[in-house]
């Protein structure tokens, strides 16, 4: 079960709700999670999205996801999925904070370049696969009449 609060400008409410609902019910159905998704200008930060926890760093259950406003639909969905992968990493404990430093497994990721951080590599690898899975499972990739038989 999760709680979702959205705010900001330049986003599609139904898409945000739909992607989040699909991801949370598929990958974390038994966890009680509080999600706050804020849409705002992030261009100065040179990012499309951020994910951070808002409560206890040992077992975080409240998260803030910030997303760039006015993205294309595909980029928006992929970015939201990417940040939700980080939520899953925090919840399952593969990403954690210890003594003020962030770790992925036993690797201190703060000394690594962003592109080399293992939790980012995992999220980037999964975002494309999960994006396609989302489109297929929600019927957006293939309209019902054109869907391959094994997907009906």
How would you label these PLM feature ranges?
Residues 1-11, 33-46:
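Hydrophobic or amphipathic, alpha-helical segments that drive membrane association/targeting
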Residues 11-32:
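Zn2+-dependent metallopeptidase catalytic core
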Residues 26-32, 94-96, 134-142:
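Surface-exposed helix-capping loop/turn segments at secondary-structure junctions
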Residues 40-75, 90-91:
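Active-site scaffold of zinc-dependent metalloenzymes
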Residues 74, 90-121:
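Post-HEXXH active-site segment of zinc metalloproteases
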Residues 78-91, 123:
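Active-site recognition of the HExxH zinc-binding catalytic motif
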Residues 113-116, 127-152:
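Long, well-structured alpha-helical subdomains associated
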């Amino acid at each position: 079960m999760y709680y979702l609060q959205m705010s900001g400008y330049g986003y599609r409410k139904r898409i945000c709700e739909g992607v989040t609902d699909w991801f949370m019910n598929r990958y974390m159905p038994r966890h009680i999670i509080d999600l706050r998704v804020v849409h705002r200008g992030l261009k100065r930060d040179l990012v499309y999205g951020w994910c951070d926890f808002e409560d206890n760093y040992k077992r975080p259950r409240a998260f803030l996801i910030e997303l760039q406003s006015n993205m294309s639909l595909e980029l928006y969905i992929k970015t939201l999925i990417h940040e939700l992968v980080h939520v899953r990493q925090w919840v399952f404990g593969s990403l954690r904070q210890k003594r003020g430093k962030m770790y992925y497994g036993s690797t201190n990721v703060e000394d690594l370049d962003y592109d080399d951080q293992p939790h980012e590599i995992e999220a980037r690898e999964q975002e494309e696969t999960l994006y396609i899975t989302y489109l297929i499972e929600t019927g957006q990739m293939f309209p019902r009449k054109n869907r391959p038989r094994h997907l009906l």
